[in-house]
Amino acid sequence: MGIKKFKPTSPGRRQMTVSTFEEITTSTPEKSLLAPLSKKAGRNNQGRITVRHQGGGHKRKYRIIDFKRNKDGIIGRVATIEYDPNRSANIALINYADGEKRYIIAPHNLKVGDQIVSGADADIKIGNALPMEKIPVGTTIHNIELKPGKGGQLVRAAGTSAQLLGRDGEFVIVRLSSGETRRIHNVCRATIGQVGNLDHELLNIGKAGRSRWLGIRPTVRGSVMNPNDHPHGGGEGRAPIGRKAPVTPWGKPTLGLKTRKKKNKSDQYIIRRRKK
């Protein structure tokens, strides 16, 4: 993927960068793999905001992605590489030999016309999905399952990858893109290769309006609010927060406070925590 820069014809254009979408081969998605997607705007079933800074944005259709990769032994051919507004990675439309069509996360260097396959007997080739007990040590992988048959949950964002470091009984040891090293059951599946769209992290939003197109609302500092809106608010001019440590709008400590559970069940599988 290339990155397009603009002449500074306005303050919004000055820093803005956009993708050239060179890898995208079609702008029309497969209708049978689309689903309606209603906007939640950060609200729960009571209508209360549970996630701030969400709302608005362009209307989207959800693309049904095959994270399970459980169509074993049937060869699929890459028909298109497409843009997906719901994720940072691109997606690939796969036409299988039995006539079924599925979307998958598009790995780096996967091209139209390439053949992929899933299952324990699949070759170690970009886009193929196998149980991790069949993947050689040192292989770069993505779309990793945490529970057998549940579908890939880890390493799905653009440009990310993990590495299979070794084996430990019925587990494999995997180093994730965050730097965390953890054990995962060796029956769980993973896809060979790195997630595509590597330049996504280099994009610059450039202006506030483009964030609004993405459904991201402004983040307002508590110190510029009134005291009835935030514990940091009020005072004359640029007043300090008047507390030992910063807090959330609801008075709970934040900015540096650890929020992970003390007795998280997954602690037993983590060998080395992620990089800070």
From Swiss-Prot:
Keywords, ordered alphabetically: Ribonucleoprotein, Ribosomal protein, RNA-binding, rRNA-binding
Annotated TM spans: none
Function: One of the primary rRNA binding proteins. Required for association of the 30S and 50S subunits to form the 70S ribosome, for tRNA binding and peptide bond formation. It has been suggested to have peptidyltransferase activity; this is somewhat controversial. Makes several contacts with the 16S rRNA in the 70S ribosome.
GO biological process, one term: cytoplasmic translation
Family the entry assigns: Belongs to the universal ribosomal protein uL2 family.
InterPro entries hit by this protein: NA-bd_OB-fold, Rib_uL2_dom2, Ribosomal_uL2, Ribosomal_uL2_bac/org-type, Ribosomal_uL2_C, Ribosomal_uL2_CS, Ribosomal_uL2_dom3, Ribosomal_uL2_RNA-bd_dom
Organism this protein belongs to: Brevibacillus brevis (strain 47 / JCM 6285 / NBRC 100599)
Protein name per its UniProtKB record: Large ribosomal subunit protein uL2
Quaternary organization: Part of the 50S ribosomal subunit. Forms a bridge to the 30S subunit in the 70S ribosome.
Disulfide bonds: none
GO MF annotations, alphabetized: rRNA binding; structural constituent of ribosome; transferase activity
Any single GO CC term annotated in Swiss-Prot or TrEMBL for this entry: large ribosomal subunit
Residues annotated as signal peptide: none
Keyword Zinc-finger: no
Region (Disordered): 221-276
